[in-house]
Amino acid sequence: MIAVRTGSKNDPSTNTGLAHYLEHMLFKGTDKYGSLDWAKEEPLLKQIDGLYELYNHTTDPSKRKSIYRAIDSISQAAAKFAIANEYDKMCQALGAEGTNAFTSTDETVYINDIPSNMVSKWLTLEAERFRKPILRLFHTELEAVYEEKNISLDRDGDKVYEKLFAELFKGHNYGLQTTIGTVEHLKNPSLEAIRNYYNEYYVPNNMAIIMSGDFDPDAVAAEVAAKFSYMQKTDIMSYVFKEEASINKERSFDVVGPDAENVTIGFRIPNAVTEEARAAKLIDLLLNNSVAGFIDLNLVKDQKLLSANSGVEQMMDYGVFMLTGKPKTGQTLEEVKDLLLGQLEKIRKGEFDKSMLDAILLNEEISNITKYKDNESRCFFLKDAYVQGIDYRDAYNDLAAMREMNKDFIVDFANLFLNQDRIVIYKRKGESALAEKIEKPEIHAVELNRDKQSQFVKQWLAMPSKAILPEAVNLKEVVKREYVGPAVLNYVQNTDNKLFDLTYRYDYGKWHNKSLSLVAPYMKLVGTKGYSAADISKAFYRWGCKFAFSEGNDHYNISIDGPEEFFDSAVWLLDRLMNEPAVDEVVCKQLVQDILKNRADAKLNPSAIRRALSQYAIYGPQNPMTWTLSNQELEKMKAEDIVKLLKGFKNIKHSVDYYGPREQAAVAKTILTLHALPADQTKHELAFDLGKSKSVDQLFKEQTQSARSVYFVHYSQVQASINWFYKSSVVNESEAAITTAFNQYFGGDMSSVVFQNIREAKALAYSTYAVYNSASMKNKPNMMMGYVGTQADKFHDAIGAMNELLTGLPKNDDIFSLAKQSLINRMETNRIKPEEYIGALHSQEEMGFSTTVPDMKMYAALPNLQMGDIVKFHQERVSGKPYTLAIVADRNRVTNADLSRYGKVTELTLEQIFGY
């Protein structure tokens, strides 16, 4: 991870969005890589620079179009000397995963997860990346940023966030400008301003290389010093701002859009370096720790609101404390606000005691133990400390400092900062004013030269690296099994810490019984004999434990985790809850009403609509999404029905999965003593909805397509979301190597054929992919699927581009070799964690696959694959198929005539795709 301590806060007021699109350009190469002939490319790029400056200062529409045509023309000429995405190709050769970057208010961060034997090559690559970045292929990348902006214009949540910050920070760039930038500024970029920004902020005293993993820190530090020695320290002008004036008055604003209604309340607080930041974190957890906070118990568990949360966003100069809530049916947003503020008032009055703080600190300690096991989490922790100007040792000791904080300080902070000086944003449902989307400029596709390689890349690829062999783990050997009564105990000992994870895994899931979906939400709201729901939540939280009910398609998990010292207590209380749950018809009735409200809200959410439509496109009207209780069936449900279902779990065949420090024999003894086990491992007696003769894997049949078809759902938005689906052959373990290699080459990441053609060359989408998706259930078919999210005015171009790639596969032996080597490198260096053994064993056994991971047959097969194998796979499984398209778009932007070009059109209602 490489963090630069600069973000949108530092954007020039005349070029907002600059930090963000500079982040995009840091993937385009330097004068040494990304170029076929720098001497010929450079003068053309200088011409483009000058044209953009002229374009910026021209207001006449016809002259601007003429200038942009010139930019487009010269860009095509310059692209003949460019090699697109050589950075991503090198990352692929490393075996890197998660290659990405992001920009926020105070930071720009570049991320890679690399094999430990590739650290030296990665440092060579990054040192060159930041030496002299070249702003090539700019106008097509800017189109991707336009798409990102248009996506934000469709998101009600983004509008709320922007309005909140604009009102909280009247004199600070946190509120005066956004990370994505204004439409006007995005349409008038300045390459000169980008270079000036880079030269000012991308300097060694404003950057940090942050690493966590298996390496020698002293050796790496010396290598960093040598390879980045070209960088020169310079003075950086600090961002200067005037302290925001305090206004002891609530100010409220409306944001209107098609998504569900909600309330957001924001308070301006001091920055992350202060003691007040710790107080804010403690108050956040007192209110909302997801188990036993004031909001959790009094608003969510007591069913006063549909949902409610608190949160803190800490930045370099200020922080923001937020409360959010969604109304129940018939509730006003003003009532939601009052309920949220009522819980905050408890903090202001000091209505909490030391035991609550002790429980919070214990749970935070447990959270840190889990978090700091993960390399990525460690890096983000160090990154946050660096960006916010906190010594990492102080940040690491944050918990100890919070233990020393007294109650009076917390109460004083709440009264001083979480008071009337607040902003309330009411997100109301309705038609918003038509967003000023960025229209598609007239540009032409550029050459990518993907079959070419710069001299730098050739030399870099030839750099040696220490070989690492994969570590094969036989899951049947590392997972110890024994019978505990009639149940199988799967056991793995935790030798790292004193935390346990226990799961009861039942052979009964939501595909067996639609009503099963009510168990988890009901059990969060009720208690058991002698214990209220609040009592149970407080007890688990006091112990640092969590319990969860979660449904799968063909199984159901009930789990607990926490410190070993409370294992027996947690097992006992969970079993009490499972076997003696309260029958509360009032809670059940209100739960049903909340589910109905959530269902109505889902129909307003474009992501939920897209997911539902995708299921319909794959399976038809009977699919996993519509496999649900109707609203009428739901309203007839009673608490006694849910309780009967839950009590029946003790008669269902299940396994007991344990990962923790306790010895296996002791775990078995506890389970036999405290957990209700079936007399025999028989199946559940409750009726299977479609008849007991039908197997769950045959419940839903993927549609067999004989002709192209289009399913369409209308949603008022700037973007059009387009999915492709085609049912292929039954999943087969022996095809793992070819399918994985195909995906890596064709559509799996930023260096893939799909991404390079649709986004990089043609600038038709911000997000796009295409993969051959292996089935997750035995004997089920694989699915070829693709996706493009694009502006409605690029609709036909985007579909045409994807269809072209699905029909004919561009061939490049060098790029395929890199893709193949990337997979081999990952298999050699990735390691399965002990806490993952049991879950992996279940998955492999259910699929009928080898229980040794990684798949050593796949590892042996990968080196022998050739480009011709990928071409053959594409011809047989991908090309010429009658794809089903699932499209969510605004019918005023995408007409029926537009849709009918791609097959028989079926417009579906929300009721049809959701099943209610």
Summary of predicted features, one role per range:
Residues 2, 23-27, 31, 524:
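Active-site-flanking alpha-helical
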Residues 119-122, 217-221, 275, 331-335, ...:
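Short, conserved charged micro-motifs
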Residues 128-136, 228-235, 341-352, 576-583, ...:
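A common structural junction motif
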